[in-house]
Swiss-Prot record:
The chain crosses the membrane at residues 53-73, 75-95, 145-165, 210-230, 277-301, 311-331, 379-399. This is Putative odorant receptor 92a. It comes from Drosophila melanogaster. It comes from the Eukaryota. Interacts with Orco. Complexes exist early in the endomembrane system in olfactory sensory neurons (OSNs), coupling these complexes to the conserved ciliary trafficking pathway. It is a multi-pass membrane protein. GO terms for molecular function: ionotropic olfactory receptor activity; odorant binding; olfactory receptor activity. The lineage of its organism: Eukaryota, Metazoa, Ecdysozoa, Arthropoda, Hexapoda. Belongs to the insect chemoreceptor superfamily. Heteromeric odorant receptor channel (TC 1.A.69) family. Or49a subfamily.
Length: 408
């Protein structure tokens, strides 16, 4: 089985690095994406996965073209503006999924190198993992990943399967004379996609697979971001805790200087890795926030102007988009706060009995921590909770403009 139910590990068992990235890696493979495909000795499996991925995205983008065509046709008139705005958030979601997959493909080798570097500094034995509190970070990360994934995939699943479930219940259980052949997304097909039952189901399941591909590619890039930031946060917090607890008076000056030298090297490497995370993900997050602002706006507009059935569907969509932005901002804020802690810990440790040279090195550590590790999308401030409020503000401005246009 792809997702086997695993027995939860106790705090007395060693956690491997691969366990922290297994969920996004395995989930990604369900659409054919394997980050480590170049290391797969099975050439046939490698090319089959690649073919499945390309085929899935060709199918996905063919339906996106149909959505765009539907939007263009209906945006021309105020009488069909509601129908146009109904498909707009789906188009925005699709563009985000496409752009994230494109960004991952471009930065694949850099991302693999980043994961390899994180694996090199990952604590391996049980005693070290207890000091790093690896078990806590793994549990917290898995909870966030699970809830985030369920919410986002609920959106795509509800839009995909609701029309078929509704039609089936009405036809077989409620005695409806016809089986309504509707689709979960508004699409302008270049052929008659409803008259012939075979064509309808072929198109319907093609659309369902398209939604699944979009959902997985949309979610998994964020899951990889969560996995990398979680580990960097773990390293920064370990440095801060270890630095604050260090008693310089119990060691010789030579031992103190050696300790600080090793810690500075370790800190510098963690900062370099955080900068690489910024280089890989910052532009993706910029587009993500811009598109999310529009998606939240259009989904919110549909909630205020649609019938009860659509309100439920778009509320799920609205919630998933909000949570996605919040999760990214939360982990960006965690990176900033954990790396900033190092300076406070350096100041709070018992440095009074130490030498002048030791104190001078501490000053450099404190000065470096004034510029914390962060993710900095172009034109945006470093990602934090303040960024979340900025995205919400942008969404509301678009929403107010749209309501003014629609209601006059």
């Amino acid at each position: 089985m792809l997702f086997r139910k695993r027995k939860p590990k106790s705090d007395d068992e060693v956690i491997t690095f691969d366990e922290l990235t297994r969920f996004p890696m395995t989930f990604y493979k369900t659409i054919g994406e394997d980050l480590y495909s170049d290391r797969d000795p099975n050439v046939i499996r490698r090319y089959l996965l690649r073919f499945y991925l390309v085929l899935g995205f060709l199918n996905f983008n063919a339906y996106v073209v149909g959505e765009i065509a539907y939007f263009i046709v209906h945006i021309m008139s105020t009488t069909t503006l509601l129908e146009a705005t109904a498909v707009a958030p789906c188009i925005g979601f699709s563009f985000m999924a496409d752009f994230k997959q494109f960004g991952l493909t471009v930065n694949r080798k850099r991302l693999v190198r980043l994961l390899d570097d994180l694996k090199e500094i990952f604590p391996l034995d049980l005693e070290a993992q207890r000091k790093y509190n690896v078990s806590f970070y793994r549990k917290h990360m898995n909870r966030v990943m699970t809830l985030f994934t369920i919410l986002c995939m609920t959106y795509t699943s509800s839009f995909s399967f609701y029309p078929a479930i509704k039609s089936t219940i009405k036809y077989y259980l409620m005695g409806s004379e016809i089986f309504e052949r509707n689709y979960g997304f508004h699409i302008l097909f270049p052929y008659d996609a409803e008259t012939d039952l075979t064509v309808y189901w072929f198109s319907y399941w093609g659309l369902a697979h398209c939604a699944y591909v979009a959902g997985v590619s949309y979610v998994c890039v964020d899951l990889l971001l969560i996995a990398t930031i979680t580990q960097l946060t773990m390293h920064f917090n370990f440095i801060a805790n270890d630095l604050e607890a260090y008693e310089g008076g119990d060691h010789t000056d030579e031992e103190n200087i050696k300790y600080l030298h090793n810690l500075v090297v370790y800190h510098a490497r963690a900062l370099d890795l955080s900068e690489e995370v910024n280089n890989i993900f910052s532009f993706l997050i910029l587009w993500n926030f811009i598109a999310a602002s529009l998606v939240i706006c259009f989904a919110g507009f549909q909630i205020t102007a649609s019938n009860v059935e659509d309100i439920v569907l778009y509320f799920i969509f609205f919630s998933a988009s909000l949570v996605q932005v919040f999760v990214v901002c939360y982990y960006g804020d965690e990176m900033i706060s954990s790396s900033s802690r190092i300076g406070h810990s350096a100041f709070n440790q018992n440095w009074l009995p130490c030498s002048t040279k030791y104190k001078r090195i501490l000053q450099f550590i404190i000065a470096r921590s004034q510029k914390p590790a962060s993710i900095r999308p172009p034109t945006f401030p470093p990602i934090s909770f303040n960024t979340f409020m900025k995205v919400i503000s942008m969404s509301y401005q678009f929403f107010a403009l749209l309501r003014t246009t629609y209601y006059g």
